[in-house]
Amino acid sequence: MSGNARAIRVGEQMREELAQLLRDEVKDPRIGFVSIVKVEVSRDIRHAKIYVSVLGNDQQKKETMAGLASATGFLRSELAKRLQLRYMPELHFALDESIEHGQRIAQLLVQVREEEKRSEREEGE
């Protein structure tokens, strides 16, 4: 279990460092409003799946993911300088749309509540 705890700890460190690198160091104009949602590191610390949330339309998301793919080498080398690891995991970026799904559900719930209020008012008349 200690290997799993270590992978979680490394993932959290990577999330913090990647967020700072994307904010301060990466100058690719394709990379817009990106949030690092979660980093899952394999037990052997060889692979890291980085879940990102991107603000924008589908085209902007595609461009951002392409920008992240092209910046992977730079990000990996910068992480190697900042984190004291024997092996630097390979970085794999994945789009996380759970925030958008949550916003859509919240929007639908608001619409349902408004319709319920409207129907209650109509019944009362």
UniProtKB/Swiss-Prot annotation:
GO terms for cellular component: cytosol. It is found in: Cytoplasm. It comes from the Bacteria. Keywords: Cytoplasm, Ribosome biogenesis. One of its GO terms (biological process) is maturation of SSU-rRNA. Disulfide bonds: none annotated. One of its GO terms (molecular function) is ribosomal small subunit binding. Pfam families: RBFA (PF02033). InterPro entries: KH_dom-like_a/b, RbfA, RbfA_dom_sf, Ribosome-bd_factorA_CS. One of several proteins that assist in the late maturation steps of the functional core of the 30S ribosomal subunit. Associates with free 30S ribosomal subunits (but not with 30S subunits that are part of 70S ribosomes or polysomes). Required for efficient processing of 16S rRNA. May interact with the 5'-terminal helix region of 16S rRNA. Belongs to the RbfA family. NCBIfam families: rbfA. Monomer. Binds 30S ribosomal subunits, but not 50S ribosomal subunits or 70S ribosomes. This is Ribosome-binding factor A. The gene is rbfA.
